[in-house]
Amino acid sequence: MEKLLLGVLLLAFLPEGMTQKDLRGKVFIFPEQSDTAYVTLIPRVRKPLRSFTLCLKAFTDLTRPYSLFSYSTKSKDNELLLFVNKVGEYELHIGNTKVTFKVPRPPYGPVHLCVSWESVSGIAELWMNSRPVGRKGLRRGYTLGQDARIILGQEQDSFGGKFDAKQSFVGEIWDVSLWDHVVSLKNLCFTCYTSNILNWKALIYQAKGYVVVKPKL
């Protein structure tokens, strides 16, 4: 009953232009390089984050830098950013501070990425295709701001904007999930729809520019 009431309230107060959909089995396709194509995601709950787990799946053949997930506040453009600097080199930014994870032999094809971070220890953990990549430490004691713009397809150099086409994502993204706590990545189901901040089966979003929603291949 509580979940049903929450769903009704969310639908009643959706920002103008936003929609909520069950996107299971669907993907966002970003067909070409641009600084105008992106998807804005609205969290189901707005709260400061002292820990999180972020998971998503993506496919691209880009070899240049690109953004996978951009969470920006008015004080920190890279409050939370998952960024690929080059093939096999993944950057996690927390509060404008970054750590880099290197994958010796990155696979060609779709990747399933999960990253978690907790403020109490500052430890960030990255997994790729259900295998651990490593752990790094950053921003111990930090709290992510709650009033954020969350964007797929572009990297925010200012709050909600200042996009650079040369950092845009070209390809497909799906199954984006964000929790407000650390999930055991070792036991995380390959396709999991239990996340409480961003949930792919009840995603609130708005697509701008050349973005297409299609069934997953």
UniProtKB/Swiss-Prot annotation:
Gene3D superfamilies xrefs: 2.60.120.200
Subunit structure: Homopentamer. Pentraxin (or pentaxin) have a discoid arrangement of 5 non-covalently bound subunits.
CDD domains for the chain: PTX
Keyword GTP-binding recorded: no
Signal peptide (UniProt feature, chain positions): 1-19
GO molecular function ontology, one term from the record: complement component C1q complex binding
Disulfide bonds: C55-C114
Keywords recorded for this protein, A-Z: Calcium, Disulfide bond, Metal-binding, Secreted, Signal
Family annotation (InterPro entries): ConA-like_dom_sf, Pentaxin_CS, Pentraxin-related, Pentraxin_domain
Protein name in UniProt: Mucosal pentraxin
Cofactor note: Binds 2 calcium ions per subunit.
Residue ranges of domain Pentraxin (PTX) in the record: 24-217
Alphabetized SMART domains for the sequence: PTX
Subcellular location: Secreted
Necessary cofactors: Ca(2+)
UniProt KW Calcium keyword: yes
Binding site for Ca(2+) 2: E155, D157, Q167
Superkingdom of origin organism: Eukaryota
Similarity field: Belongs to the pentraxin family.
Residues the entry annotates as binding Ca(2+) 1: D77, N78, E155, Q156, D157
